[in-house]
Amino acid sequence: MLHMPIPDAGVLARRTSIAAHLRRMVPDHAVIDSEVSLKAYESDGLTAYRQPPMLVVLPQTTADVSAILKYAQAENIKIVPRGAGTSLSGGALPLADGIVLGLAKFNKVLDIDYANRCVVVQPGVTNLAITRAVEQHGFYYAPDPSSQIACTIGGNVAENSGGVHCLKYGLTTNNILGLEIVLMNGDVVRLGGKHLDSDGYDLLGVLAGSEGLLGVVTEVTVRILKKPESARAMLIGFQSSEDAGQCVADVISAGIIPGGMEMMDRPAIHAAEDFVHADYPRDVEALLIVELDGPP
């Protein structure tokens, strides 16, 4: 059972003045304080736990984020950054005496550099939108969480998201080249860049998966890849989950890295088949769905 911290009564008593101060930093409509509107931010995808935040603010520039964080630190106000709220881990669960910093308005693709095989985007750009921006030139962004149509790249960095293809192509941390982040004192720093061997310490791995605890991401440089010439999927049935697991181990130990590999046990097979009617076989105990990509 998750126990939320007891709200700071002193901060809650200043709610009206805090909202007024925020409205001097961002447009009036970018501060959300009505009870009805705050309901939309009371949880992320982990809906078993929910509570409305004290306020929500929707900045549109790095300068906005910096000013808000400086103010929050000076006034001892808690901040919870939020992308699209698709996480199932509670990473964007708000605090009753805190401000949710919604980054949905940061949704621009800033630069596409095919020569260096990278794209610079704002954190509110969705995962799938990156691929959509480059696919006409034969490129794509490899990490593909199941929520890729909705989840944002900023949230992917915060959660170090993966997906079906992470076995071969890695998680978010393996596919980001640079970040612009705003520290909790409002300072803006840049880490990495378009080139693999950028100067300075490699702190990107520390930030990937930190859920906004170390700073707020305001710009991301991601690696893009050429689309494989072909991709084929196969479905393999097994009489036990142990046999399926051993098959995975045998494939990897043979030095073969499929583009994607997913295993389903009997309950998952039946649940999926009842819902989507994908024509999965019901007479097996486990399934491996394997994708092979590369030359035809």
Set out the residue ranges of the language-model regions:
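Flexible loop/turn segments at secondary-structure boundaries
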Residues: 39-40, 87-90, 127-129, 224-226, ...
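N-terminal flexible segment immediately upstream of the FAD-binding catalytic core
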Residues: 1-70, 74, 86-117, 146, ...
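Short, acidic (Asp/Glu-rich) active-site segment that either coordinates a divalent metal cofactor
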Residues: 89, 100-103, 213-221, 295-296
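Feature of Fe-S/electron-transfer and energy-metabolism proteins
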Residues: 1-14, 36-40, 57-58, 63, ...
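Short, hydrophobic beta-strand segments
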Residues: 2-4, 49-55, 234, 285-294
